[in-house]
Amino acid sequence: MSKPRSNRRHIDGVLLIDKPYDISSNNALQKARWLLNAAKAGHTGVLDPLATGLLPVCLGEATKFSSYLLDADKGYRATVRFGVVTTTGDVEGEVVSERPVEFGREQLEAALARFRGEISQVPPMYSALKHQGKPLYEYARAGIEVPREARQVTIRKLELLSFDGVSAEIDVLCTKGTYIRTLGCDIGEALGCGAHLTALRRTATGGFSLDESHRLADLESLDMPAREALLMPADVLVMHFPQLELADEEIGKFLHGQPVRFEQKCEKMQRFRVYQQSSRRFVGLGEARGDGRLHPIRLLANQAQA
């Protein structure tokens, strides 16, 4: 699937992928990169191989702003199987215990209520978190349990969509760093029977939704111009910052890394999406630091050369 590096193009933008089941996020990214023959690509948050759903892929200069999506809230739809605990917290693991499921919808709703808001989570052993330079899952596969510190995360939304007496489908909106596998397992323990995930689908990240994404198989059927037409501009990653336009005489200085005069009242350390006034083109991010100047902090290289 690889193409010679010399033939890859400098192309900028964001492509929303619907990651399929049983491939890694990196494999999905590399496939998208290959389909667009892009020189540079990066994603904005890893999905487990068994998880599906929204995976924003940043190409070219858009990779400079990918961290803003890493920090964004995420939405998921998950299926939780109660009464069965596995080593990994999902269907890939070996069964370690089975207990009867002896609760109804009312008790389940009450348990879910306890997990809304700020909660404490212990990261799972089967995760990419590192300990002494190695991911935790390598220790787990070797049968080694590594102590992990609990971390605070926020569950902004936790809604029960369906329950058949054994499995429940839940809709979750959470802050970064939340492990949905751990959430499902913890809900099961709170109900006295344990649980694991049988399905997980990311439905949202930042301001993007799964409805806007594209399947890799569909992209393969398109020609290159049609694929390029699906790219979103880099500034979609930073739309949560206020917009600011600079006059042409200031934009040159700004694009060469020099701070420019800024007299607008705002909070100290406020960041702005910066555009050239005449062309309306996005050039990068600037930061007001309370010194009467706007400092460039992240610029599009292709705009600096324009």
Swiss-Prot record:
This is tRNA pseudouridine synthase B. Keywords: Isomerase, tRNA processing. It catalyses: uridine(55) in tRNA = pseudouridine(55) in tRNA. The active site is at residue 48. The gene is truB. Its EC number is 5.4.99.25. Pfam families: TruB-C_2, TruB_C_2, TruB_N. GO terms for biological process: mRNA pseudouridine synthesis; tRNA pseudouridine synthesis. Gene3D superfamilies: Pseudouridine synthase (3.30.2350.10), PUA domain (2.30.130.10). GO terms for molecular function: RNA binding; tRNA pseudouridine(55) synthase activity. Responsible for synthesis of pseudouridine from uracil-55 in the psi GC loop of transfer RNAs. InterPro entries: PsdUridine_synth_cat_dom_sf, PsdUridine_synth_N, PUA-like_sf, PUA_sf, tRNA_psdUridine_synth_TruB, tRNA_sdUridine_synth_fam1_C, TruB_C. Belongs to the pseudouridine synthase TruB family. Type 1 subfamily.
